[in-house]
Each structure stands twice: as structure tokens, then as C-alpha cells.
Amino acid sequence: MLTSQYIQHLSVQAKIANMTLQLRVYVPEHPLIKHWLSVARDVNTPSVLFKSAMSELGRWLTYEATRNWLPTVDTVVQTPLTRCSATFVNPEMPIGIVPIVRAGLVLLDEVQKVLPVAAVYHLGLVRDESSLEPSCYLNKLPDRFDPQTRIVILEPMLATGGSIMMAMKEITSRGIQPDLVRIISVVAAPPALRQLSDYPGLEIYTAIIDEGLNSKGYIVPGLGDAGDRAFGT
């Protein structure tokens, strides 16, 4: 079902077996998103180009995610010729960007260009390679958010769902309702999407929904470790 000229609303039931809830997952049908995803997937893409591809994906996905979501105000401006009606993003409504460190940093620069007045709250999570469980080593979230704050979470890979669920718990416990949250992800997998169905009203914007995970918790076909590839480690 197409929700606009650009965004395809996917029925997750059709994509993920044995799932009873329909998530609000959007995969924008834009050729530039497909192009940069293909660049990022290619194992032969050098680190510097991989990072550029991920940044571009962050920009385009954020553009789509904020299309009908940012609060606006109507006013009148004076052009060089006459007065006319105008619409601005409401500067009094707070916006927060939460990059999941470290891979989320790859998306941050271009996302900030789309949302230049947004505050940035870093959240550092690391996944244990044996248990695949996340732990938090850096939390720059405020004790409480203004309840009207729009939150954009940057998590390039939605794999097992452990990290994003921890992030959602931290954010919602500070006064944010799920319907004010948008998740920007480059590649998503069924296990993470199943868990995120616990949050009604949450919307996820991703370049692709892949088949699943391997024994090490990596998305297949995926694009490898986004942090390692972006930072050359």
C-alpha cells in the first residue's frame, strides 16, 4: 500500500512469518536510497565511500521520516515584491537526535543538516559477542524530556533488537511517547522488528528489510559491521 508518491507502507505480516502485529515500517521507494544501499552492501566499497553512502542514507531516510511529522507554524513574510503566506518548522517544539554510538554516528552528520536545530543526545551501547546482549557505557539523555519532544533514533542495523529495545526503554522512561519517536535504520531484520511491535505508534524508516540473522547475530545479507566498515577498524 502506497502512503504517498514516495513511501511504501509495508505489511510486516507479509514480510515476517508468524508475526501477528503490523508494524508501521516504511521502506522509501527512492532510487537514490536504493543506489546508496547497494554501494554500502558491496564488500569492495572502501571505508571512506562506505561512510559517505551511509551518510547519504541517513539524510534521505530522515527526509522521508519527517515529512508529515515536524510541527509547523503558518505566518506571513515579505518578499522583494509583496507579502505572502509562509510555513516554518515550529522552533518552539523541541527535537532530539539520539545516535546509538558508535555506528549511529555514521548517520549523524547528514541528519543534522536536515534537522539543524535538533539537540543531540549520545547513547553508547555495546553488544556482547557471545550472549548478543547489549550493555550501556554512555548515556547523555536528560533525566526527563519535554513531553512534546520529537525523537529521531539513529541505529543503522536493527538486528537482534537488543540495543534498540534498550534505547526505547531509556527514552520512553524519560517521558517520551512512542508515537513521537522515529527510528532511522539502514537495514532491518525480523527479530528486531518483532520486538519493536511492543511500541504502538512507533514508526521505523529503513532502506531494506533483510531475511534474518546468522549464528553471530549479523543481518544476512546485510552489509557487515557498519561501525567497523565506516571507521576502518
Please identify what each model-predicted range represents:
Residues 1-233:
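PRPP-associated nucleotide enzymes
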